[in-house]
Amino acid sequence: MSIAAVAMVLNEADIIETSIRHLFAEGIDEMYLAVGECDDNSWNIIESLDLPIHMYHDTDEVWHQAAWTNELIARAGTDGHEWIVPFDADEFVYATNSDSIADTLADCPHDNLLLHQWGHHSWGAREVTPRTQPKVAFRYSFGVTVSMGAHACSLPGGQWDVLDIREWQFLSFDHFCKKVRTRIATLDPVERARGNGWHMTRFDGKSDEEMRTEWEAIQAIPTIADPIPSRLPPGLGLVGQA
């Protein structure tokens, strides 16, 4: 049994090493990443890691997330991986039973997993209520595809409470502004017309002052003390570590 993680990456230098190392600590075997035209050093950070990562350069100005993710899934499946775990750079997948992802999937009888997505305001502060849309992880079969954002896949059914995700989407107010505006500028117009990316496009055209109000509203969402579950050893100097 082998597991591949797949993701698109754009301007995630602040957190990408942490999320990558987290998944490998969970027993992921290989990773397939489409890295966009970053204006930070995301590419160099990933390239410098001594880990089994396949990197592909996404030179398109438009964020074709579903198409790229499905291409990465197909490549991972062709390479023989049984399980596929899509993720975003700001997401941390974990097993709800406290075992590693690898140990959990080795004994999993299900083919399509639905993951609760819990928002974080810091490494240790989790929102009380999960996001409305799930994420997916699944056993590979030829032709399987996911929707934009990997909120659904083409396999039937779906089992909750095997894996979940913690998402630390915005690290600071400045990070919030830059990330939102970059995502809006690169969003596929076709996907936007379908209503996808609404969690970003709802901020379109807002001034810095208006964005500050939105940031404060996000920070006011109730949280509890519940750190991101991770097998990362302390002292690596990664995001969230003292």
Language model regions located:
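Short beta-strand/loop segment that forms part of the nucleotide-sugar
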Residues: 29-37, 57-58
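A structural signal for isolated positions on well-ordered beta-strands in alpha/beta enzyme cores
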Residues: 4-6, 30-32, 54
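N-proximal low-complexity "stem/linker" segments adjacent to membrane-targeting elements
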Residues: 1-24
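Catalytic-site signature of metal-activated, phosphate-bearing donor transferases
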Residues: 66-70, 95-242
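The conserved acidic donor/metal-binding loop of glycosyltransferases
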Residues: 88-93
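Short acidic/polar active-site loop segments enriched in Thr and Asp
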Residues: 29, 82, 111
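Active-site-proximal specificity loops/subdomain of glycosyltransferases
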Residues: 41-86
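A generic secondary-structure signal
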Residues: 22, 71-75, 104
